[in-house]
Amino acid sequence: GTLVMLHDATVDRTTDGSGKLSDLTLADLQKLRLRSDEGGAQAPLTDQRVVTLEQMLAKAKGHILLNLDVKDAIYVQVIDAVARAGMQHQVIVKTEAGIFTAPLAAMPPFNTVYFFPILINAHGTADLAAIATAQARNAHPMAFELPKMAAAQLPALVAVSKKHNVRLMVNSLWEGFIAGYGGDADAERDPNKVWGRMYRDGVSIIQTDAPEALLRYRATLEAR
């Protein structure tokens, strides 16, 4: 098969087609048009087509860092494609890690790329700092991706982050992943209150659907 860039297991939400991705040929896929924004039947169609991972890597090479959200147990194949493209230091690869998960950043294939373990916050009460500590044992992930979590869980994670020199990444998508900090809509109104608070409290990588606004805010910090 061919590795392609698509979020869902079906093409229904994000394209003008229907059916399972695994049932379609590459030729079938490349006839489909992508829908705008988050997709859905009411979302306007664009002139954009589904692209392969190889095409995406070639387009991004030398320009941007790609966050590859791998949707199946195909990490070896994905990272092999990244290596063939010579982009091991231009992609982020992530997978979930719990308290009993071995330190993944030290293991193939994750040890060849920028790897972020996604900390599992079981029932919203996990000892995230302990999971992060375990993931940094004889390993050096580039960052810990934070799950939806309580604000009270953050300080201990910041301490682990500083001790092991591993950055913290958080989503400000939707209502945001740290309770009480706010999300993208709040940040576009008052970036210092949301993104600024995250940064001041120890987060240095933010995933957002408002990248232009975040870049503008970051520029104000750099100018200080």
Where are these regions (language model features)?
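Acidic helix-start/capping segments at beta-turn-to-alpha-helix junctions
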Residues: G1-L6
